[in-house]
Every structure is written in C-alpha cells, then in structure tokens.
UniProtKB/Swiss-Prot annotation:
Membrane topology listed for this record: Lipid-anchor
Organism: Neisseria meningitidis serogroup A / serotype 4A (strain DSM 15465 / Z2491)
Lipid moiety-binding region (N-palmitoyl cysteine): 15
Keywords noted in UniProt: Cell adhesion, Cell outer membrane, Lipoprotein, Membrane, Palmitate, Signal, Virulence
Name of protein: Adhesin MafA 2
BP GO terms, sorted: cell adhesion
Lineage: superkingdom: Bacteria
Compositionally biased tracts (Polar residues): 282-297
Region feature (Disordered): 282-313
Sequence similarity: Belongs to the MafA family.
Subcellular location: Cell outer membrane
Length: 313
C-alpha cells in the first residue's frame, strides 16, 4: 500500500502531452513523414466506393483545403534533475586567538612638598599575533540524477509543399483507372466526380511522464466525394466520406531509448460535418437540380452550357 501511495504522485506529477501546431508538412519531408502521408492518402482513396461508375468516363474535380501555414514547436525535454537533487555540507568549528601587546605608562606629579606617581597598562589596537584552530571534520556530499535523453526539442518551421496536392490527385486517378473508370477531359465525360479533401496534413505530439515518454507523428487524410450523371443530373454516388490516419511513435523510458517503435494505419473519425444528409428544396424550379431518386425514368433538361460543351462549341 505504501508503495502504491508513493507511485501515484510520481506518475501524476508533471504529466502532460505537448502537441505541436497541426500543419501540412512541407519543405523537404523526412522519410517517416513521407511514409505516413502516403499511407493515409492511399488508405483513404482506396476506401472510395466507385462501383456505380463502372464503365463510365469521368471528369474529375479535386479540391483540397488550403495547406499554407507555419508553426513553431519550442521547449526542451524536461530533466528529472530538477526533481531529485540533494546535498550535505559540513564545516568544522573554527576558533581564532589574538595576542595584543601590552605596555605600561608611568606619570609623576609634584607640587611643593606633595608628589604622586600614576602607573597604567595599555594594549595596542593591533594584535601582535593570531592563532586559528579548527576542530571537527570537514565534509561535503551531494547526490542528483540528470537525464536529458537526446537533448532539447528543436524549433521547427513547417511550410507548404504544393506537390502534396498533385500527389493526392494522381492517387485518385490511379484508383479510378484500376477500378475500370476512365478519367477524361470534361468535354468527353459522361460523369462528373467531385472530391473535396478537408483534412490532409500531419500532427506532432509529445507525451512526458516521469518514467514514460513518447514522440508521436500522425498523418490524416479525410475526404468527401460524390458523382453526377452529365445527362440526367442524377446522383450516381451520394456524398460519402473516407477518412484514415497513420501513426509513427517512439517510446522512451526517462528519455532513454527508444525501446519501442511502432507504425499503424487505421480508419479515423469521420468529418465533423458532411453533406450526406442534404437534399434538394422541394419547391425548386432549377432545371439542372440533382435528382436523388434512382431509376425514376425522368430526364431533366440539360442546360445550354452543357449542350455547348457537348458540341465542342
């Protein structure tokens, strides 16, 4: 029981996770970051259900959340030296004896038949000798523990990498091709596919306990997509989401190690808000409004702009 009571404050004191400002990577990525971003992107794109587009020619429109920005992660890894430190200092007793010289002064006073003699002894105000004696033992003891691990956590500036968007777009096109869906210019397409990428970036965090420490890097990709038939304006694919995250983590003990390194890829939580529950207004008069009914036999008029593009005019 006593051991448990001692461990509770040791584990709970000075605990916390320092999370860096989320950013979209950039600059020259290191290999682990490249691997994580690629893994989350591939997993999210691979999850897209494109079965309704089999055999179709699709025009692809990809829109990615702005990925420009910067942030600093500052502060060093804490040292346990400030928590465990003690010292003992002992000085011997010291006594000093001063020897001051003495001198006698004699004064004689005479008046007629009377006379007096006065004698006095005085000390000089400066010692003639000094003797210092020390008694007892002198000792000094100190104890401490300093663990700095791999040193301070350096400042880092995260910049934008425009090639990330191009990489993600190429992944989507690759999946379309492998699924048997041809991606063509808009003027030759019979289907419009819209992909909105809401989250596409990395998050760094650091966990610090007295005995356990961890460095974690996550990459997240979250997107929403839907498809519309060019002629009928029907929704071939209602709005759907795909979200995945990959993680790289190093685990330390007193910032020594890492004793464990792990990589994982898993489905992430979905978008906080999506468009899967949006339907057209019932009283709309728009000619080209989306048709949410499947196989209803209706074929709304195609707008003039669509006809013009069909004819190549």
């Amino acid at each position: 029981m006593k051991t448990l009571l001692l461990l509770i404050p040791l584990v709970l004191t000075a605990c916390g996770t320092l999370t860096g400002i989320p950013a979209h990577g950039g600059g020259k990525r290191f290999a682990v970051e490249q691997e994580l971003v690629a893994a989350s992107s591939r997993a999210a794109v691979k999850e897209m259900d494109l079965s309704a587009l089999k055999g179709r020619k699709a025009a692809l429109y990809v829109s990615v959340m702005g990925d420009q920005g910067s942030g600093n992660i500052s502060g060093g890894r804490y040292s346990i030296d400030a928590l465990i430190r003690g010292g003992y200092h002992n000085n011997p007793e010291s006594a000093t004896q001063y020897s001051y010289p003495a001198y006698d002064t004699t004064a004689t006073t005479k008046s007629d038949a009377l006379s007096s003699v006065t004698t006095s002894t005085s000390l000089l105000n400066a010692p003639a000798a000094a003797l210092t004696k020390n008694s007892g033992r002198k000792g000094e003891r100190s104890a401490g523990l300093s663990v700095n691990g791999t040193g301070d956590y350096r400042n880092e500036t995260l910049l934008a990498n425009p090639r990330d968007v191009s990489f993600l777009t190429n992944l989507i096109q690759t999946v379309f091709y492998l699924r048997g869906i041809e991606v063509v210019p808009p003027e030759y397409a019979d289907t419009d596919v819209f992909v909105t990428v809401d989250v596409f970036g990395t998050v760094r965090s650091r966990t610090e306990l007295h005995l356990y420490n961890a460095e974690t890097l996550k990459a997240q990709t979250k997107l929403e997509y839907f498809a519309v038939d060019r002629d009928s304006r029907k929704l071939l694919i209602a709005p759907k989401t795909a979200a995945y995250e990959s993680q790289y983590q190093e685990q330390y003990a007193l910032w020594m190690g890492p004793y464990s390194v792990g990589k994982t890829v898993k489905a992430s939580d979905r978008l906080m808000v999506d468009f899967s529950d949006i339907t057209p207004y019932g009283d709309t008069t728009a000619q080209n409004r989306p048709d949410f009914k499947q196989n209803n036999g209706k074929k709304p008029d195609v707008g003039n702009e669509v006809i013009r593009r069909r004819k190549g005019g």
